[in-house]
């Protein structure tokens, strides 16, 4: 059974199994709430083609650390970083041809780019 939040009866998510809440605060802050605590990701542009992500963790309940969503957070963040670096390498390849956004796969990227242009 996955570790989930104990949600009060007067909350809109009462009765649901919620393992994590994710908030993105434009443009570069992500707050990831888990039953064990909070993971903070800060995206720090270092130049036109270089970005650093600073990860911070605040453990509120050590007994839940390592369980459920966010339980193996270091591994997941390493995998995410590898995927982003691989995509970047492919997009910088001479064979890559930029095209339209994929409506089924790139809604988040499209939304982010629209926010940047506003």
Where do the language-model regions lie?
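C-terminal catalytic domain of Rieske-type non-heme iron oxygenases
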Residues: 1-118
């Amino acid at each position: 059974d996955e570790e989930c939040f104990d949600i009060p009866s007067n909350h809109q998510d009462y009765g649901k199994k919620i393992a994590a809440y994710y908030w993105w605060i434009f443009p570069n802050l992500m707050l990831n709430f888990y039953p064990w605590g909070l993971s903070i990701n800060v995206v720090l542009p270092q130049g036109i083609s270089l970005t650093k992500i600073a990860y911070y963790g605040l453990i509120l309940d050590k007994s839940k650390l390592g369980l459920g969503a966010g339980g193996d957070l270091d591994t997941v963040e390493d995998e995410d970083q590898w995927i982003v670096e691989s995509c970047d390498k492919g997009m910088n390849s001479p064979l890559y041809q930029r095209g339209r956004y994929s409506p089924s796969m790139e809604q988040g990227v499209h939304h982010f780019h629209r926010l940047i242009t506003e």
